[in-house]
Amino acid sequence: VFFNHSTGICDMQLKHVPASRLFVSEPDPSWFGNPPNEIPSQNWLESRFHFSFAEYSNRLNSNFGVLRVMNDDFVQPNRGFGTHGHANMEIITYIVQGKLTHKDSMGTEETLGRGSVQFMTAGRGVQHSEFNLEKDTGLRFIQTWIVPRRDGLFPQYGSFDPDHYGEKSRNRNICTARNQWRHLVSDTQDTSSDTPVRIEQDANLFVAEMDADQSLDFLFKNDRMAYVLCVEGSVNLITDSGNKVTLHRHDGCEVKPGGGRGDMTLTFNTIGSEQVEGGDLSAHVLMFEVDHVEGSGRQDL
């Protein structure tokens, strides 16, 4: 915790999780029903694990509160994850680049593009597949698993597609707004939020695409924490007291409350932009805000 001697208060905690400290998985193509790679130096999948998962076992980095999995996946064209099962997780997939085609045992089949969110309550059990069916475009998505408030829920699927959502919603800014937070996911029990995705846990997903030299604030309640991912570009995170962490593409950051004070503001400043799908120059951040759990987060940094 940072102590500000001029104010006599404890500032919020920022823990940088650099991309170099993420486990990068490049599994054998046969694991998910893909043929051998045509180019040996390029694997069909490159997956960055923010928490312990699959062949990456690290008891010092197992979760962040109710966030159990966050994988940053890049899938080559004409490749994907064959049919496999899940149970007792809220699974949220945010598409960054390309198109994701989903099929499941509930009869759902859908293709979603950049800025879309796919979500599943795996509950009692569901089988699904995820593929990049494009011939020459890579697919990047962020998939997060959240522990539900109880096991054995009835499985269900849903999605948010910004190309169509605005046609039927009063909250049209959520589809196209830049330089402001887009609140995409909230708790089914939260009656105060108007989000396109609702899950069975006290967790919120916010995303923002920011132009050059833009600044954006987020107000944290003193009993909340967040995990931030820099999806594209570069940003500075600055606390009320001026403490700063710089994030570049693939970097993460744990944000935790300080002690002895109420709400605090975290400022996000664009310091580097990338040309993204669609042609815009952007810094792009994703943030899961959840209930604070003492002792959460990486213990090996």
Label every PLM stretch briefly:
Residues F2-L301:
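Jelly-roll (double-stranded beta-helix
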